UniProtKB/Swiss-Prot annotation:
Gene name as annotated: mnmE
UniProt keyword Coiled coil present: no
Enzyme class: hydrolase
Localization annotation: Cytoplasm
Keyword Lipid metabolism among record annotations: no
Species: Bacillus cereus (strain ATCC 14579 / DSM 31 / CCUG 7414 / JCM 2152 / NBRC 15305 / NCIMB 9373 / NCTC 2599 / NRRL B-3711)
Annotated K(+) binding sites: N230, T249, I251, T254
Highest classification ranks of the organism: Bacteria, Bacillati, Bacillota, Bacilli, Bacillales
The protein's name: tRNA modification GTPase MnmE
Subunit structure: Homodimer. Heterotetramer of two MnmE and two MnmG subunits.
C-alpha cells in the first residue's frame, strides 16, 4: 500500500526535556533532509541518530538544535520510512519544527494514523493495534502486562487457531458434499462435526472466562465509598491514594459532591469514588450530593461501607446495609482508636458474609488488610497477567460472545438432525465474527472509528 507522508508531534504538549516530531512515508527522509543542517540524511544508514539543526529555508535562520533518528522501511513501526526529530521540549520550538515540515508538502497526521498504517501495512492486526491504546492507558503493572501480551499477538494467535480449525472443518464439509465419490476422504459425519464445533465453542468460552478480570485490569473497579457523614470516608480515600485529595474535618457534611480518583491496590486498579455522607438534610446543595451518592452506589462494582466504631449503629447505617445487598461490598469499621460503642455482632450480621475490617485511619491501621481483601475479592489473591491472555476490550468480548452463540447454534442444529450443508452457514458466520477481532473481516468504517480514538502522533 502507498500513502502520502504524514507528520505529528508524538510527545505530550507542554514544557519538558524533549519533544519528538514523527514523520512517516516513502519520502519522509527526503522531506526532513531539506530543512536539516548536518549530515546528508538521504545517505545515512537505517536505525541511526544524527546531530544537527533545523533551518527555516525562507530566512536561513536556525530554529532548533536537534537529534534526528532515521529508520528505513520495512523495519519500522509503520513499515514505511520514519524520521523522528528530537527537539527541546516546549510548545513554540516544536510547533515551529512541525510547521516547517508541513511546508515541505507533508500532511498533518490524523489521530492514530501511525498505528493505523502499521495495521494497514500488515505489521500488526487490529487487536494488537487496540492494545497500543490499552498500554498507553494502563494504570497498573498488571494492566500493562495484559496490554503487552496482546500487542505481542497472544490473543491474535488464539483467534487465528480457532479460525483455522473452522476453515479446515468447512473445507472437509465441502469436499464431502461436492465429491462424495472420493473414498480416500474421511466422511464428515454428524458426530465428527459436533465434536469439532463443540471444541471451538469450548475454546471461545475459555477465552471469555478471563473477560471479567481483563475488564477490571483495563478499566478499573468502580468503587464507591459510602456511609453517614463524618465516619471517615474522605480519610479512607486519602489513605488509599496516599495523599490528601479530599478535605477532612470534624464537621459533618464537608464532602458535598462526588470525588473520583484512580489508585493501584496490589495491582488492581480502583476508580475510587468518595461520596457525600448519606443522611436526611434540609441543605439543598448537600441533598443533591446525597442523591448523587446513592446513584454512584447503585452503579459501583464494589462498595466500601464505612461505619463509626465509636457510635452505635443508626437507622441510616442499617438502611445502607440493606441498599448494598446483592452487590460486592466490604464493611470498614473506622475509628477504633476511640472507645467502642458499636455492636460488632450486629455489624457482622448485616454484612451477610462479606468481609468486615476494623481500621483507625488516623493511626494508619487496617489499610493493608483492606487492600488484601479487595485483591482477594476480585482475583482470589492471584492473577498471572504475565503468562495468561486476558480479553479486556469490550468489542472483543462482544464479538467472542456472538461467535460462541453462533457456533452453539451450529451444534444445536447438528444435534437436531439438520443437514450438514445447512450448518455451513453458522460455521462460516463464526469464522467471520472471529475475523472481526483481528481485522481480517472488518469493515473500513469500523477501522476509521477505532483509530480515531487514538491520540495525535500515535
Amino acid at each position: 500500500m502507498e500513502f502520502d507522508t504524514i507528520a505529528a508531534i508524538s510527545t505530550a504538549l507542554g514544557e519538558g526535556a524533549i519533544a519528538i516530531v514523527r514523520v512517516s512515508g516513502d519520502d519522509a527522509v527526503e522531506k526532513v533532509d531539506r530543512i536539516f543542517k548536518g549530515k546528508d540524511l538521504t545517505e545515512v544508514p537505517s536505525h541511526t541518530i544524527h546531530y544537527g539543526h533545523i533551518v527555516d529555508l525562507d530566512t536561513n535562520q536556525v530554529i532548533e538544535e536537534v537529534m534526528v533518528s532515521i529508520m528505513r522501511a520495512p523495519r519500522t513501526f509503520t513499515r514505511e520510512n520514519i524520521v523522528e526529530i528530537n527537539c527541546h521540549g516546549g510548545l513554540v520550538s516544536v510547533n515551529k519544527v512541525l510547521q516547517l515540515i508541513l511546508a515541505q508538502g507533508v500532511r498533518l497526521a490524523e489521530p492514530g494514523e501511525f498505528t493505523k498504517r502499521a495495521f494497514l501495512n500488515g505489521r500488526i492486526d487490529l487487536s494488537q493495534a487496540e492494545a497500543v491504546m490499552d498500554l498507553i492507558r494502563a494504570k497498573t503493572d498488571r494492566a500493562m502486562n495484559v496490554a503487552i501480551n496482546q500487542m505481542e499477538g497472544r490473543l491474535s494467535k488464539l483467534i487465528g487457531l480457532l479460525r483455522q480449525e473452522i476453515l479446515e472443518t468447512l473445507a472437509h464439509v465441502e469436499v464431502n458434499i461436492d465429491y462424495p465419490e472420493y473414498d480416500d476422504v474421511e466422511e464428515m459425519t454428524h458426530n465428527i462435526l459436533i465434536e469439532k464445533a463443540t471444541h471451538v465453542r469450548s475454546e471461545i468460552e475459555k477465552i471469555l472466562e478471563t473477560s471479567k478480570q481483563g475488564k477490571i485490569l483495563r478499566e478499573g473497579i468502580a468503587t464507591a465509598i459510602i456511609g453517614r457523614p463524618n465516619v471517615g470516608k474522605s480519610s479512607l480515600l486519602n489513605s488509599l491514594v496516599q495523599e490528601k485529595k479530599a478535605i477532612v474535618t470534624d464537621i459533618a457534611g464537608t464532602t458535598r459532591d462526588v470525588i473520583e480518583e484512580y489508585v493501584n491496590v496490589r495491582g488492581v486498579p480502583l476508580k475510587l469514588i468518595d461520596t457525600a455522607g448519606i443522611r436526611e438534610t434540609e441543605d439543598v446543595v448537600e441533598r443533591i450530593g446525597v442523591e448523587r451518592s446513592k446513584e454512584m452506589m447503585s452503579q459501583a462494582d464494589l462498595v466500601l461501607v464505612v461505619v463509626n466504631y465509636s457510635e452505635a449503629l443508626t437507622n441510616e447505617d442499617e438502611d445502607l446495609f440493606r441498599a448494598v445487598q446483592g452487590k460486592d461490598f466490604i464493611v470498614i469499621v473506622n475509628k477504633t482508636d476511640l472507645p467502642q460503642a458499636i455492636d460488632m455482632e450486629r455489624v457482622t450480621e448485616l454484612a451477610a458474609g462479606n468481609r468486615v475490617i476494623t481500621t483507625s485511619l488516623i493511626e494508619e491501621q487496617g489499610i493493608d488488610e483492606l487492600e488484601k481483601a479487595i485483591a482477594d475479592l476480585f482475583f482470589e489473591g492471584t492473577i498471572d497477567s504475565a503468562d495468561m491472555t486476558y480479553v479486556s476490550n469490550a468489542r472483543h468480548i462482544g464479538l467472542l460472545t456472538q461467535a460462541g452463540k453462533t457456533i452453539g447454534d451450529a451444534v444445536e442444529a447438528i444435534e437436531n438432525g439438520v443437514p450438514i450443508d445447512m450448518v455451513q452457514i453458522d460455521l462460516t458466520r463464526t469464522w467471520e465474527i472471529l475475523g472481526e477481532i483481528t481485522g481480517d473481516t472488518v469493515h473500513e468504517s469500523l477501522i476509521d472509528q477505532l483509530f480515531s480514538q487514538f491520540c495525535l502522533g500515535k
